[in-house]
Every structure is written in structure tokens, then in C-alpha cells.
């Protein structure tokens, strides 16, 4: 279900399949006929990443994509900026199929329209914090002085104004992830992809980062796709939640819909797990 009828979709994922192996077309056809991963592997030797995923990502909201390890959530998010291309299906950004983009337009998409935050921070150890934040701006050709000014502004917004001259190995894990977040936001992209961005952090630092993301989102209203395996994190952050299992969508809904009307036993187990871990 969509969040509400007034919220436009920023991204539309239509019947997306991803399989790895030589008999790709046959594997997709078997999946369309209802075959599971085990049968596809046995008959084609192909490994299934995604099996007919369709969902919408509403503009200006946080969509959490969650599931267990191997469910396809990281594979899916990497399709949204074409780090991975699908075996079949379409991915529309503002109504335009990004699979039709040539390399120059794809580079422009990644430099200006979609940014990404990874679990492993991805900071360059030989650059100081300010230059790490400015990196995306410099890559797309912004003047160095302007890029560093923008980087300093974002460091202030994430609470690291005094750390611009430090190097990544001088920072804690939480601080490094703040740098990664500032770097992603500095290019002012409309879409922010966050792949298990807080998963490696200690629980208290993770909670603080969730708070900071929610606070920034109140002001920025970005379209955020947040990957997590933690139902508590998804329910706390998400305006919409998409739950995957074995490369398929089990349920899409608001946190309230997921809690009150789980689509099946699989989704209900996530909700029960969340309630069992509440203090």
C-alpha cells in the first residue's frame, strides 16, 4: 500500500529480476512460472538475487527495505543507481527508465541525483575529513574552494564542525559514519541510498544516528531508501517498509500496517521479535 494518495512516487520498481549464471533467460522464465530458488538452481545452475520485485518509493519519505541476510535487500538497492543491472524489469526515476541511460547520463545520475552511504563508511584514509565530504563535489567538477565550503557546512550540520582537519583513523565509528552521511548529503541529491548504514555501530551510537537522520529529514525531505535487517530500526525510521524474503516482496506498508496487519506468518514473526525485544 502507498503512504497516501497525495504523495507522488519518486522511484517505481517494476517486475525486477536478478539472476546470476549462464542460463539467465531460462531462470527468469522459471521464476515467472512460480519456481523457487532451489528449483532454479537445480535446473539452470543460476543463483537468484531478485524474483519479480515490484514496489514504489514515495518522494520525500524514508522507505526501509528489510529482510534476513540473503533476502535480496542490498541487491535491490544497488539496482537503484545501477551498480547492478537487472536480468529483467524496469526501474523508473521520475518516470524515466534508468536502464535506458548511456554511460554519460548514468555518471550524471550518480553525481547529482542519487547518493549512497555504505555500512563500511568508504572514507579515503589519505584525505582529511573535510576533503572526504567534498569528494563527490570535486568529482563532478565543482570549484575546490566552493566544495570545501559546502563540506564545512555539512560537517557543522552533523555535529563535526571541529573535525574537518582530522583524518578518518582519528575518529570513532559513529563519527566516521557521520562523515559518510555528510558526504552523501553534500551533493544535494534528491535520493539517498543507505545500505545497512548504522549496522556496524554500537547500540547507543546507532540510536543517536537514527535520531540525527530523522532530524535532518525533517528539514531536508529527501527520498531515502534505508536497508536494514532490524525490524525495530525499520519501524522507527520508516514512513514505508518493504519486507523481502528470498528475493520477493512479502509486504509493503506503513509501520502501523506492518504491526497491525502483517501479511503472513513470516512478517508476523518479525513483529513478534520486535515486541519480545522491547524493554
What are these regions (language model features)?
Residues 252-253, 261:
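ABC ATPase "signature
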Residues 30-39, 96-97, 145-162:
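Conserved ABC ATPase "signature" region
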Residues 127-135:
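Short coil-to-helix segment of the ABC ATPase nucleotide-binding domain corresponding to the Q-loop/switch region
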